[in-house]
A protein has these predicted regions:
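Glycine-enriched alpha-helix->loop->beta-strand junction motifs that scaffold or abut catalytic
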Residues: 193-199, 270-272
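Active-site cores of enzymes that catalyze phosphoryl transfer or operate on phosphate-rich substrates
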Residues: 95-102, 202, 223, 227
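Auxiliary Fe-S-binding modules of radical SAM enzymes
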Residues: 1-25, 29-44, 290-292, 304-306
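Radical SAM enzyme [4Fe-4S]-AdoMet core and its adjacent flexible, acidic
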Residues: 208-228, 232-323
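Conserved alpha-helical substructure of the radical SAM core
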Residues: 73-190, 194-195
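N-terminal [4Fe-4S]-dependent radical SAM core
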Residues: 5-21, 25-30, 49-89, 107, ...
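Conserved radical SAM core fold
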Residues: 109-110, 150-152, 181-186, 198-220, ...
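A cross-family glycoside hydrolase active-site/sugar-binding cleft signature
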Residues: 89-91, 142-146, 176-180, 200-204, ...
């Protein structure tokens, strides 16, 4: 049973210091050993008494217990759903021209497989209309195209963009797309530039790393060179668009050397100035077990350590991997 007469706190210590987490103020306070010993073990000390009195006067160590945790927006949830939706993700197809080894549709994940399913225009239109009807209080709206490989349905993407421009021209709508980058043509690039569509490329690292997992369907041919050609094409057609609208999603395979990937992302001229989002391959919801090499874990933890040091101003940020 909880002691309702004790302050609502949690005491903890490190190798050298003592702390109190004050729940009601959501703050961590460094205290003396004497105060820690009194609050944790009820061992009285004159020094502790003075320090505790000071903390109480500053608003800490209250006995109030939380009876209900409730988000401040809970009472407005229905209104948000009716008027403040701001994002729509359209899975325009489940088809893909690649067979990435860790894809959720590869057959290794529970309840997911590649299929030939495509979204109809009627479904896409209905979804867009629903978003519009439930976003009247949202200043900006975001529509994302996803797959499979969404560029296999470029025709539908164009239909959606043109419909939104025609019917909802008074709204600020942002379009974005996640792609393996192998199907771009000058026509598609020009259309994306014209409509300011943001592109997120799936890129796992240099050629030998990327091609290990991202191969074309029906072959063992890697997709790096084709993706690279698309990046160069967009950059050559409109550098400002490229710098503003192109980003990268990188999946780290724990069997690869982390340093090689970080150096590639940091130094490549078509990548280093653009935003990269990185995630580590895991075996959640899959029948395959993901194995981590000792070198990968060591390098990853070292980069985390350097990141913390940079936040403490102990080292310059330039020594921390940008990714």
């Amino acid at each position: 049973e909880k002691n309702m007469h004790k302050p609502f706190i949690h005491c903890f210590k490190t190798a050298k210091e003592y702390y109190v987490y004050d729940v009601n103020t959501d703050k961590i306070i460094q205290v003396s050993f004497e105060t820690y010993n009194f609050l944790e073990n009820n061992i009285w000390d004159e020094k502790a008494e003075r320090e505790i009195e000071k903390l109480i006067n500053e608003g800490y160590l209250k006995r109030t217990r939380v009876e209900e945790v409730k988000h401040f927006a809970t009472d407005f949830l229905e209104s948000y759903l009716e008027n403040r939706m701001n994002q729509l993700v359209l899975q325009v197809t489940q088809k893909c021209n690649l067979r990435c080894s860790y894809c959720v549709y590869s057959g290794d994940y529970k309840n997911r497989n590649h299929s030939q399913k495509e979204m109809s225009w009627e479904t896409a239109k209905e979804a867009v209309d629903y978003l519009y009807g439930h976003s009247m209080s949202s200043e900006d709206i975001y529509i994302s195209f996803y797959g499979g490989e969404p560029l296999l349905m470029f025709r539908l993407i164009k239909e959606v963009v043109e419909y939104v421009k025609r019917e909802y021209c008074q709204r600020t709508v942002h379009f974005n797309l996640t792609t393996n980058g192998t199907l771009f043509t000058p026509e598609i690039v020009q259309y994306f530039i014209k409509n300011n569509i943001q592109i997120m490329f799936s890129l796992d690292g240099p050629k030998e790393v990327h091609d290990k997992n991202r191969i074309f369907a029906g072959s063992n041919r890697g997709s790096f060179e084709k993706l690279r050609d698309s990046m160069k094409m967009i950059y050559s057609m409109d550098r400002k668009y490229y710098k503003k609208n192109v980003s990268f999603n990188t999946v780290l395979d724990p069997q690869n050397e982390l340093r090689t990937i970080y150096e590639f992302l940091d130094k490549d001229r078509l990548i280093s100035k653009n935003l990269s989002r990185i995630s580590v391959l895991n075996d959640n919801y899959t029948d395959k077990q993901c194995e981590f090499s000792g070198e990968f874990v060591e390098e990853q933890e070292y980069e985390y350590f350097k990141c913390f040091l940079s936040k403490l101003k102990r080292i310059n940020e330039k020594f921390v991997a940008r990714a």
